[in-house]
């Protein structure tokens, strides 16, 4: 239900999101609490190799884990990309992958 919502830095839904806010909101709807930042989310569970990623796993990007998306299967993630862009699906390989975490 977040697909197409605008990116707003610091927003955690439901009308707008930043990348980590989207992950926090989505997992929160499933009753799982996540930390607020992508860096903290990268450490909020079990690390798994990309080859074992399942829908719902968090994929963090760049060496500083400054971006995060949610794996949805089929080599795709859903994420809130950047200001001026809406929440969308994109290839899991859109940026250099830092880690895959299963909350």
Where in the sequence are the language-model features?
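Aromatic- and glycine-rich peptidoglycan recognition patches
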Residues: 32, 43, 47-51, 66, ...
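Gly/Ser/Thr-rich beta-alpha loop segments that engage phosphate groups in nucleotides
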Residues: 6, 12-15, 71, 75, ...
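Catalytic cysteine-centered active-site loop
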Residues: 2-55
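Hydrophobic beta-strand signal
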Residues: 58-60
């Amino acid at each position: 239900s977040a697909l197409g919502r605008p990116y707003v830095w610091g927003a955690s839904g439901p009308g707008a999101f930043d990348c980590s806010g989207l992950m926090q909101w989505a997992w929160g709807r499933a009753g799982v609490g996540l930390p607020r930042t992508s860096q903290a989310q990268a450490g909020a569970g079990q690390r798994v190799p990309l080859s074992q990623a399942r829908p719902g796993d968090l994929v963090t990007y760049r060496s500083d884990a400054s971006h995060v998306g949610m794996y949805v299967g089929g080599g795709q993630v859903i994420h809130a990309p950047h200001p001026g862009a809406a929440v969308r699906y994109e290839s899991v390989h859109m940026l250099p992958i830092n880690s895959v975490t299963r909350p």
